[in-house]
């Protein structure tokens, strides 16, 4: 009997756990048995691996093979275990200490083709981060994943000045076997990505705000939303630019920093699909109004996949025709909006997906879309019921409400301000708020993220503005959460204006954006 070992990883959500792959080659009829809560993709790899080994001019054992994936209690899914299982089987009879040492320090990822080539797999970034946490020396990925793997920040040994973990890229099973036996060298993922020209690919171009005709109130609302990370809702007749403004909101946001880029790219990697390069700008996700709860939050049979809210992590989630989305689906957004993550409970495990996004809702004022109630053809009860699916608790979590005007009210506008011009003010406001929260020791990426109690206690508006907030709360026209959101809005407006503290005018503008009419004494 002979025993081979290799390392791979199991991915649950956007977190990976290192998995020990053991292969026992012993007497018995020629067959392979895989144990350890493996899914269908892993179980079906038997014939694929055997054919790939034969076509790579390598030797497959002609006896019984038992492959164990541990920890056995953890569900495992995906074809990325192929390479690790092949290497554990092929090296089971090896007595070379170098082979054993290399495999004990290396995480192997990749799906094998029938010709022995390695095919790219999903979830490379979470595995790299898990290997880095575990202190392993290297990770080998398919060359098709080189650009994604090149994003990881590899720690450096302070004494030796060399990387503590290397990320290598291989094109075939035979090449990895040659490396294991110290016959060939594998290139780094960074060098392969540079040769492929995909290591620094840009995300799709964001449309310009100058394309939006008129709508000064909605444009201003989008600027405030971008500066403070606030959620917003637009209501107006069809064709007034609601979707255009929402699609241009990511262009007003600052580019993602290195950490945000890795996090957002990791979510898209776990979701699968073709890798088009790192997520460098805030993503924009706009599912159809027929979206289901599982498509919005994530889920699916087997290992859950991230939904639209997670794909919009560090970006914008736009739900057009919000009045057509079932109330149960919309209400499922309440917890992610508050906590910044999605928790899916399964029988064997819980899955967590990050979901820190800006929500933008858009809807027509009524089914017929008329701007003026006098010209509306809908029955009164139908008009009143039109937006009833947007519950009070969800409305309470929105910061900005804005009405877009009909086409006749915006004709003749030209030379509107560009995205680049607005973004300069947004970036300046964000830098101003970030410096303020940093000096105070408050952990927040934007004004929206500041704890409400800290804001009320340590960062109130001036006395007149706070009195106005208290009066509005006392009238019962808004909840305490609504007042907190207005105070955050006031801070964002003050940051855009370059003020050191929100005043009465800033609070009045916040009331207007929040949808509460306010009269300000001269």
Q: What is the predicted role of each segment?
A:
Residues 314, 320-321, 332:
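Walker B catalytic acidic pair
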Residues 35-46, 59-61, 68-78, 304, ...:
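Basic, amphipathic alpha-helical bundle interface domains used for macromolecular binding and assembly
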Residues 1-233, 243, 345, 500-522:
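Peripheral, non-AAA+ core regions of ATP-driven protein-machinery
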Residues 236, 298, 321:
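The Walker A (P-loop) glycine that initiates the GxxxxGKT/S ATP-binding motif of P-loop NTPases
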Residues 19-25, 296, 399-402:
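Short beta-strand elements
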Residues 115, 319-326, 369:
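Catalytic P-loop NTPase motifs of RecA-like helicase/translocase cores
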Residues 234-274, 339:
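Walker A/P-loop
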Residues 223, 277-278, 283, 294-317, ...:
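Conserved alpha-helical scaffold flanking the Walker A/P-loop in AAA+ ATPase domains
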